[in-house]
Amino acid sequence: MSKDDSIKKTVTIGLSAAIFFVLSCFASIPVGFNVSIETSVAFLAFIAVAFGPAVGFYVGLIGNTIKDFILFGNVSWNWVLCSALIGFIYGLPHKIIDLKYQVFTKKKIVYFWLYQVAFNFIIWGFFAPQSDLLIYGQPPKLVYLQSFLIVISNILAYSVVGIKLMSMYSCHYNKQATLIKINNS
């Protein structure tokens, strides 16, 4: 990785973590049981797919840490680590999806939608509630109800906001690439 790439990724992480925090605070819809539909989750998926797993990991880690500390006064490290992990996992297929240089086709939309559904169930439906049970000893019914609502709200947020962000980003870069090819001809 060149020096310019590392600077771009560092700046992307910082700005994206700040946007993640702002979206968590001001662009979420409460659904009950201390659960909200978070547009920040869709933004995390977009950033991770656009810039890769390392950026997704750090945006999830830093953004969720800042959110927890400022909103709640303490940090639930198990949930922060789950956010970081989901950011990393979202970023793994970034070279396959390649929003910057390839069209975000229906096939890629369906692929990533199924991918994020599966990993939302694994991370937020299994790891997060298990960690709450082990660390905090919370009532299992409440923990699993919350995790179910979180999985559903994350899927909804990605379906509505995430797909739109990725499509717009892909369209922007693909139009630029087309214009560059036309001008160079």
UniProtKB/Swiss-Prot annotation:
Keywords: Cell membrane, Membrane, Transmembrane, Transmembrane helix. InterPro entries: ECF_substrate-spec-like (IPR009825), UPF0397 (IPR022914). Signal peptide: none annotated. The keyword Iron-sulfur does not apply. It is found in: Cell membrane. It holds the Pfam family ECF-ribofla_trS. One of its GO terms (cellular component) is plasma membrane. The keyword Cell membrane applies. The chain crosses the membrane at residues 13-33, 42-62, 69-89, 109-129, 143-163. Its main location: membrane. It is a multi-pass membrane protein. Belongs to the UPF0397 family. PANTHER family: UPF0397 PROTEIN BC_2624-RELATED (PTHR37815), UPF0397 PROTEIN SPR0429 (PTHR37815:SF3). This is UPF0397 protein PAM_019. The lineage of its organism: Bacteria, Bacillati, Mycoplasmatota, Mollicutes, Acholeplasmatales.
